[in-house]
Every structure is written in C-alpha cells, then in structure tokens.
Amino acid sequence: MQAHELLQYFRLPELVDIRQYVRTLPTNTLMGFGAFAALTTFWYATRPKALKPPCDLSMQSVEVAGSDGARRSTLLDSDEPLVYFYDDVRTLYDVFQRGIQVSNNGPCLGSRKPDQPYEWLSYKQVEDLSECIGSALLQKGFQASPDQFIGIFAQNRPEWVIIEQACFAYSMVVVPLYDTLGADAITYIVNKAELSVIFADKPEKARILLESVENKLTPGLKIIVVMDSYGSELVEQGKKCGVEVISLKAMEGLGRANRRKPKPPEPDDLAVICFTSGTTGNPKGAMITHKNVVSDCSAFVKATEKALVLNASDIHISFLPLAHMYEQLLQCVMLCHGAKIGFFQGDIRLLMDDLKALQPTIFPVVPRLLNRMFDRIFAQANTTVKRWLLDFASKRKEAELRSGIIRNNSVWDKLIFHKIQSSLGGKVRLMVTGAAPVSATVLTFLRAALGCQFYEGYGQTECTAGCSLSVPGDWTAGHVGAPMPCNFIKLVDVEEMNYMAAMGEGEVCVKGPNVFKGYLKDPAKTAEALDKDGWLHTGDIGKWLPNGTLKIIDRKKHIFKLAQGEYIAPEKIENIYVRSEPVAQVFVHGESLQAFLIAIVVPDAESLASWARKRGFEGSFEELCRNKDVKKAILEDMVRIGKDSGLKSFEQVRGIALHPELFSVDNGLLTPTMKAKRPELRNYFRSQIDELYSTIKV
C-alpha cells in the first residue's frame, strides 16, 4: 500500500460523514448521548475540587542559610521572618482601627441572655466605650504609658475586650487574672505586677480581692471596677480597707465627661503580661509586646491567605479564656478583618446552645473538647449497623481529605454528618486546635465529619501562642505543621534522652518577632527560657518529618530516671494511655530507686460501664473502680495501646490504681490550663503509690 493510500485509509471522517451517520441513529440513542453529555458537563462543573496548597506539600519548610539547621516556612520569599502582613497594622491599636474601616462600622461584639438572640455593639460603639474607660483611668491618675499595668479579672464578655482596647488606646498594659489560678496565685500576681486597679466582672471576685487587701496581702490595690451590679455593702467593705469600689458604668460616665485623645503605643511596647500557670511554684509573667501579637497574627493570615479570605461576615465564638494568648491571638485575627465576636453565656454547659444561636463561621477548639465530641458521636452509634455506616462514611470522606478535598455537601454529609455540623450552628468554615496534643484518629475523623478547613497549631505563651501551623491543603494528622512565617524553628541536642539534632530530633527552639521579651521581674527564669542568641527553648522534643513538618514526640521537662538509668518522659506515656476507651485521665509515676513505672488511672464515667459490660463485668461506677478484674482488664488495654504506639518495655506501667474522681483545678491536681500538677499528684496518691510498689514483683 502506498503512503498516500495509507493516509487516506486512516483519515478522520469529514463533518458531512458524521452528520450522515448521526441521522441514521435512532431517537432513543440520540437522547441517551445527550443525557450522557449533560451529566458529564454537570459532573465536570460541580465535581469536588481540591484546595490548592500555597506551597509544595512535600517540602513545607527549608533550612535557613548559615543558621545551624534552623528551618523556615517556604511561604517566605527570603530568610527574613514576617513581622507585618498589613503595612498599616503595627500594633493592637492599629488592628482595631483597621477593623473599623474594613467592617464599615459593622457589628463587633455580641452577647446574649438565656433563650435570647445575640445583641451587638458596633465597632464605633466599642471604640467610643473604650476611649471613655481609658479617659477615666487617666482622670483617676493612671498614666498613658507602657509601664502602667491594668488588671482584668473576668470571664470572656464584651467588657473584657472594651477594657483591653481602652488600655491599647492609651499605651497601657493588660494583666489578665482568672479565678482558677487560686487565691494565693492571684495575690502573687497583684503584687508582682504592682496592680493598683483591677476590673472585676462579678461582686464575688471583688470580695476575693478586698479580702486580700484586708489581710494586708495586697496593700497596693486601690481601685476595683465592677462590671455587674452590686450592693452598698461592697462599697463599705472597700472603704474600710482603703479601696475605692466603682461601677464600670460610673467609669464610663467619668471618662465621657473628661474625654482625652488616645495615645497609641509603639510596636515594641508591652501589650499584655500573660501569667502562665506553672505545675510547680508561682506563675511566671510572660511579657508580650504589640509586635509579638501582630507578627503572630500576620503569620496566620499569610499562611491562610489563599485558602481562607477572612472578612466582616465572619463570626467567631469566644469561649476559650481571654486570659490565655491562644484566644487573644485569634481575636486579633478577627478584629483585624472587621469580623464579629460573639461571647458564650459564661457556662460551658450551654456552649452548644450558644453555637446554634450564633452560627459561627470560626470555631477555635482544644483537644479536650474534640475528644468529647468524638466520644459522643461514637457513643450514639450504638448498634452494629450505625457503627458500620459511620465508619464507612468517614472512610469515604477521609479518602477525599487525602486528595485535598474539603467539603460539607457530599452524599455522606447529607446522610450522616449533617446533624453533627448543625450542632455547631451549621456555618463553621474554619476550626483551629492547639494548646495540647490531639489524637490523629480524632483529628482525622472530625476533619472528615465537619467538612471545614481544620488547622492544628503548636506553640506556647512565650511565642505568643503559635510557632507552627498546618499548611492549607495538608489534611494529614500526626504532626503540627510547618514553621509559621513569623519565626524559625530549630532542634537542639538533648543528650540525656538520646535525641540528636543531626538525626532530625531534639528540643524545639523558636526565634522570631513573636518570641516574648522575658518574664516580668524574673531574670533567672528568663535566662532559662531564652538563650543569648534569642532562641526560646520550649522544653518539647520535636522531629522533622520528610515533608518539612514538625512532629512533637516527647517532653524534656518532668523527665526522670528509673533505677536502671532509663530516662522517662511521663507526659508522652500519659498521652498514649488516655486513648484507651475506659480511661479518662492517667498519672504515670516512677522513682529513681524503682525499676518500673506505675500509674493512677481515672476511668471514664461515661464509657466504663458499657466497656466493662462487653467483658462480662457489672456494677455501678464506684463498684467497677473497686473491681480487681476490671483494673486488670484496663491495665491490659493500656499496655496493648502502648505497644501499638511504640512504647519501649520500660515505658510501660506494671501496675495501676483506679481512682473514681477526676483530677481537676478545684481539687488542686491540675493547673488552670489543665496540666497535671505532678508534685501535688505525687503527694495526694502517696499511699496508693507505696502500695503498688510494695505489692508488684518484677
């Protein structure tokens, strides 16, 4: 066959030929083709699309040149950390001024009474009230200076933010107090920060402060401003010990009659003294500047700018304590974009009711809340069929997650997950978790079930809340993301625990404009946290993963040795054991003269009965806690999970004692940030510890 004949043989059909062929097809066939084409077009137009990552997810951080192994975010164009995202936002005063502009004086702060809708103050109203309060402070003789400290002793509410903005407008510094610190710690902070004025939300808190003055423990306190109504006896109690008790309304009136022009702060001025509740000793006052907060806020905006455009229509639910930098940072992000902040009623038991009423788009959480949500969802799947459906649906959505797809409109959302999403108000598009480790199983399931962008961050007060964050598009769990654009992270050797930076493991150290100035009037503690080159030593042990993300694998603090010389990090072990279904809390204990570990275990009151029943045990919660066979079964389950999680044999506990009462702030066994107070736990359970060591033979 000649070449031209071959080409003619394989030629494409002419349009006339196609028309002729189509005319010969039956009508049903043509309709089928049309339907198929329409369906294909519809699928192509509506198919779920993966969120485009802002960087190569296989390389989320890179080494900084000449920095001894420090890594930075690949979202940066150079080896200089990000300080500001918006040119006109350098301080927290600037943050609020920008919020006024971009919201067009929209709603700012909202609150509600029981069974009532939210009522809102506009941005201009908040500015007006804050300037009145700030002017009143000046009229009372306080200085518009970063050396002037103002105490706030209140739950989250609009007045909290108004008073804080008053401080920022006149270059004053906020010192938050919270009742779970305990009376002794509050007294310590009042004296350490030399607080002469404190804003309290309730008369009960004012009485706590007055009693301290009456007992000559806080002689410097001169004014208490009370937000809620109170009786004349409180005023009289104050007069007797030389303290003026005045209402917030009266302060507003005083400031309105003596209005002063704001005196905005500089970026390097102090903004907040955030006292961290240590597990031992007195709390430490972390000195946080305006630049610290704004740089951390800017880094969050930079990291999410392509995936999440925050705007004035967004609504944030405020229930995590404003006394902590985590909530402070998130509110900074919201106010900077003119968003709305709605406050919970003050009772965590009513949070779900508040969520339904507010319908937030932004929902910050902590692992405790996520664990509770996860447990309740699976507790409701109480039949084999329900559990199978839940598992099947979550697996389908988790497969989409691995492809980078985030959505809440799939068939599985409509059939299975819609109720869960509606319980949060039905409009959540962003969730952030931090403050403590979260199980990869819990995080992956809730990312799938809730169908929103769900970021995990890591940090501490001393780096203004966050130093690493998930990158948009990377919805894998088991790590805490890449360095935030405002800071570098490096790992340093911890030889006693056999962690070497050369092997990609070591203590996590942070450097950048978000790192604090030091601890208030405590150079010794400051020197322990900040080295001479400005690196913050976190006390956490991290590991670099191949894609440039950071995984927290251990804890340097609280480590101890067993008799054979093995180093033990109890918090790592506790975080593994609490994954056991019947376990709510664990305190792992060891001693240098003992060769093995033991633990005090608080069973989960909600799940213990059903878990025990499946294994043939019956009885009340207290009876099950006393049952030796139940204790043995719980220990076996803990050891199984420990083995699956890679615990070494010497890291496994050899015996446990069951305790029916939760460790709590009220009984003195937890800090206000829900961390174990290990010395107190040791003393409290001394008899059980001694008994375990005397009865267990290895």
UniProtKB/Swiss-Prot annotation:
<feature type="glycosylation site" description="O-linked (GlcNAc) serine">
    <location>
        <position position="135"/>
    </location>
</feature>
<feature type="modified residue" description="Phosphoserine">
    <location>
        <position position="620"/>
    </location>
</feature>
<feature type="modified residue" description="N6-acetyllysine">
    <location>
        <position position="632"/>
    </location>
</feature>
<dbReference type="GO" id="GO:0000038">
    <property type="term" value="P:very long-chain fatty acid metabolic process"/>
</dbReference>
<keyword id="KW-0492">Microsome</keyword>
<keyword id="KW-0436">Ligase</keyword>
<dbReference type="GO" id="GO:0005778">
    <property type="term" value="C:peroxisomal membrane"/>
</dbReference>
<feature type="modified residue" description="N6-acetyllysine">
    <location>
        <position position="356"/>
    </location>
</feature>
<protein>
    <recommendedName>
        <fullName>Long-chain-fatty-acid--CoA ligase 1</fullName>
        <ecNumber>6.2.1.3</ecNumber>
        <ecNumber>6.2.1.15</ecNumber>
        <ecNumber>6.2.1.24</ecNumber>
    </recommendedName>
</protein>
<dbReference type="InterPro" id="IPR020845">
    <property type="entry name" value="AMP-binding_CS"/>
</dbReference>
<dbReference type="GO" id="GO:0004467">
    <property type="term" value="F:long-chain fatty acid-CoA ligase activity"/>
</dbReference>
<keyword id="KW-0472">Membrane</keyword>
<feature type="modified residue" description="N-acetylmethionine">
    <location>
        <position position="1"/>
    </location>
</feature>
<keyword id="KW-0576">Peroxisome</keyword>
<keyword id="KW-0443">Lipid metabolism</keyword>
<dbReference type="InterPro" id="IPR000873">
    <property type="entry name" value="AMP-dep_synth/lig_dom"/>
</dbReference>
<dbReference type="GO" id="GO:0001676">
    <property type="term" value="P:long-chain fatty acid metabolic process"/>
</dbReference>
<dbReference type="GO" id="GO:0005789">
    <property type="term" value="C:endoplasmic reticulum membrane"/>
</dbReference>
<keyword id="KW-0944">Nitration</keyword>
<dbReference type="GO" id="GO:0005524">
    <property type="term" value="F:ATP binding"/>
</dbReference>
<dbReference type="Pfam" id="PF00501">
    <property type="entry name" value="AMP-binding"/>
</dbReference>
<keyword id="KW-0067">ATP-binding</keyword>
<feature type="modified residue" description="N6-acetyllysine">
    <location>
        <position position="386"/>
    </location>
</feature>
<dbReference type="GO" id="GO:0005741">
    <property type="term" value="C:mitochondrial outer membrane"/>
</dbReference>
<keyword id="KW-0276">Fatty acid metabolism</keyword>
<dbReference type="InterPro" id="IPR045311">
    <property type="entry name" value="LC-FACS_euk"/>
</dbReference>
<dbReference type="GO" id="GO:0050197">
    <property type="term" value="F:phytanate-CoA ligase activity"/>
</dbReference>
<dbReference type="InterPro" id="IPR042099">
    <property type="entry name" value="ANL_N_sf"/>
</dbReference>
<feature type="modified residue" description="3'-nitrotyrosine">
    <location>
        <position position="9"/>
    </location>
</feature>
<comment type="similarity">
    <text>Belongs to the ATP-dependent AMP-binding enzyme family.</text>
</comment>
<keyword id="KW-0256">Endoplasmic reticulum</keyword>
<keyword id="KW-0496">Mitochondrion</keyword>
<keyword id="KW-0547">Nucleotide-binding</keyword>
<keyword id="KW-0460">Magnesium</keyword>
<keyword id="KW-1000">Mitochondrion outer membrane</keyword>
<keyword id="KW-0007">Acetylation</keyword>
<feature type="modified residue" description="Phosphotyrosine">
    <location>
        <position position="84"/>
    </location>
</feature>
<dbReference type="GO" id="GO:0047676">
    <property type="term" value="F:arachidonate-CoA ligase activity"/>
</dbReference>
<keyword id="KW-0597">Phosphoprotein</keyword>
<comment type="function">
    <text>Catalyzes the conversion of long-chain fatty acids to their active form acyl-CoAs for both synthesis of cellular lipids, and degradation via beta-oxidation. Preferentially uses palmitoleate, oleate and linoleate. Preferentially activates arachidonate than epoxyeicosatrienoic acids (EETs) or hydroxyeicosatrienoic acids (HETEs).</text>
</comment>
<keyword id="KW-0325">Glycoprotein</keyword>
<dbReference type="GO" id="GO:0070251">
    <property type="term" value="F:pristanate-CoA ligase activity"/>
</dbReference>
